[in-house]
Amino acid sequence: MARPPPPDTPARRRKQAAHARGLAAEDRAAAVLEAQSFRILARRLRTSAGELDLVARRDDLLVFCEVKLRRSLAEAAESLQLRQRRRIIAAAELFLADHPELAPLAMRFDAILLGRDGGAEHLEGAFELEG
């Protein structure tokens, strides 16, 4: 027997709106990478260590990209904390364990910062493995 749908509450609507904004932000970030000749290999990849927003490749370079949407680019830049960087690195290691053919590629951790005003900034090498 199927469960009835959850009630439509303000909290549920906020969560749905946040999810939709996140998807739209990742689409914008993917477009930034694709404009630089990257091919998107994965989006919103969940691992036991955490989620990878975007995994992209261009030639012999593999990029794990975190997408941050905030009111301003400055707020987006401040939102990438050490603990989150460590989770991203751990998730990237799990991704590479599942895709050993990609392990020989050069690897970089980027961030794409998006402001709600439409601004975008691609931070290449936003953080390192030492995290």
Swiss-Prot record:
One Pfam match: UPF0102
Gene3D superfamilies: 3.40.1350.10
SUPFAM superfamilies found in the cross-reference section: Restriction endonuclease-like (SSF52980)
NCBIfam families in alphabetical order: PRK12497.1-5
UniProt family annotation: Belongs to the UPF0102 family.
HAMAP family tied to this protein: UPF0102 (MF_00048)
Protein name per the record: UPF0102 protein AZC_4471
Source organism of the structure: Azorhizobium caulinodans (strain ATCC 43989 / DSM 5975 / JCM 20966 / LMG 6465 / NBRC 14845 / NCIMB 13405 / ORS 571)
